[in-house]
Amino acid sequence: MPAVTVDNPLVLPRIEVAADTQPRPVSGVYASHHAIEGAGFEVWRPFPGAVDATVSDPFFLLDQLGPVEYAPHEAVGAPWHPHRGFETVTYVLDGEIAHHDSNGGGGVIGEGDTQWMTAGSGILHDEVPTERVLASGGRSHGVQLWVNLPSHLKFTPPRYQPLTADHLTLLTSPDGGALVRLIAGELGGHRGPGDTHTPITYAHVTLSPGAQLTVPWNPAFNAMAYVLGGRGHAGAEARPITAHELAVFGPGDTVTVRAAAVSGSADATGNADELDVLLLGGLPIREPIAHYGPFLMNTKAEILQAIDDFNAGKLGTVPS
């Protein structure tokens, strides 16, 4: 169950779409691949891998963690590690994660919260289970998105934005069948709380069985829909989509997703009814990409410099 819910979505502002719009067709649907990250937790990753970086640009990576039920003393996280050249956006649907960084920041990312960290010139951080989760176990479900920075912002000072659940912009469709949690960017004249260096739109949408959502979409942006759970269709042509799949849209100025009317049985995430989907897109940066581990730069020389700077302690030190 998503962390931020509303008993009656019809009390929320509704996303309206003009009549003379051009629906974006679905250019492809891609399956995620399975990966092991951090200290051994499992993720589903649609990109990089299923689609090329030129397709996901300005995003480089999307990981879905869980949903998983941890037994006591079973949960693991991502110990201290560096980043440079991009932003990490960690969104927690269920459970909680503790985080710390080399600039003295820290706290707990709770259900419905988003941690928006601009690594920029460089920072060290960790994301680990809280003491409560370690002791008692519990459900964990989250998403991490890497947003690239253009070359002139690769060395911008590190920044942290704690976007708590109560600050999300909540919207709905004209019939109230969709709950839209706008994390960043603009949808139909409404803005999310995230302050982005790179122009993007990022939203978490839950659709009731059979419900449809059509949203206006910046024609200069790319557009993708990633299925967190459930089954449904994407685009005006109703391409089937299911859990852990990424739908990539072609040109146009509206995006449509629809939940299956009756699913009949639970999918791999345990979701038998609703369609849970991330809508994301942004203005492509269209610059060369050099990637190595936790660094995302433009050239191999910049990657080598990042490694040298990390080894020299120039990206920060782990607090004692």
Regions found by a protein language model. Name each.
Residues 1-320:
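Jelly-roll (double-stranded beta-helix
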